[in-house]
Amino acid sequence: MSIKSDRWIRKMAEEHGMIEPFEAGQVRFNDAGERLVSYGTSSYGYDVRCAPEFKVFTNVHSVIVDPKNFDEKSFIDIIGDECIIPPNSFALARTMEYFRIPRDVLTICLGKSTYARCGIIVNVTPLEPEWEGHVTLEFSNTTNLPARIYAGEGVAQMLFFQSDADDVCETSYKDRGGKYQGQRGVTLPRT
């Protein structure tokens, strides 16, 4: 398996719809010239943006967090250009980008250092071969202060690893009917 470069990422996005919408270069400023947390194609990855829809965890209803029987009342929905995450809490969001991962590719997501250096950690499981959808992002605020997340700006980087031609997986995410296949919007746990 080898990591793929900006040339490969551009080709796969432009010719095969791997990432939509797609930004061929790095965007660091908005139209008004104000600095952004960068997004778009980098040397060996793609920096994704957060969409303006969030689910912020709340304990108002005092429900038990159970991944097999998750209660939607555990979240407050927020739509907007930013989201405030309470201290020592978390929020779910999604990428603006929709992904279509090829059968011979595994994609790993890492949080951007701009957020990590503020105590905001991004967690995403790998995007498996032939998975497609919006990526659900989990932001953990590890600080004892409120933390701000910006929609429309970079939040995480996707790294693409392509298998050797003789070592493509036998069973893809699509083949096994993965429960998050084709997800749109912020997706809560499923069993």
From Swiss-Prot:
Active-site residues from the entry: E138
Keywords: Hydrolase, Nucleotide metabolism, Nucleotide-binding
Keyword tRNA processing: no
Enzyme class: hydrolase
EC code: 3.5.4.13
Superkingdom to which the source organism belongs: Bacteria
Pathway stated in the Swiss-Prot or TrEMBL entry: Pyrimidine metabolism; dUMP biosynthesis; dUMP from dCTP (dUTP route): step 1/2
Catalytic reactions of this protein: dCTP + H2O + H(+) = dUTP + NH4(+)
InterPro entries noted in UniProt: dCTP_deaminase (IPR011962), dUTPase-like_sf (IPR036157), dUTPase_trimeric (IPR033704)
Pfam families (UniProt xref): DCD
Binding positions for dCTP per the UniProt entry: K112, S113, T114, Y115, A116, R117, T136, L137, E138, Q157, Y173, Q183
GO MF annotations, alphabetized: dCTP deaminase activity; nucleotide binding
A GO BP entry: dUTP biosynthetic process
Record-stated family: Belongs to the dCTP deaminase family.
PANTHER family attached to this UniProt entry: DCTP DEAMINASE
Job description of the protein: Catalyzes the deamination of dCTP to dUTP.
Complex formation: Homotrimer.
This protein's name: dCTP deaminase
Organism expressing this protein natively: Psychrobacter arcticus (strain DSM 17307 / VKM B-2377 / 273-4)
Gene name tied to this protein: dcd
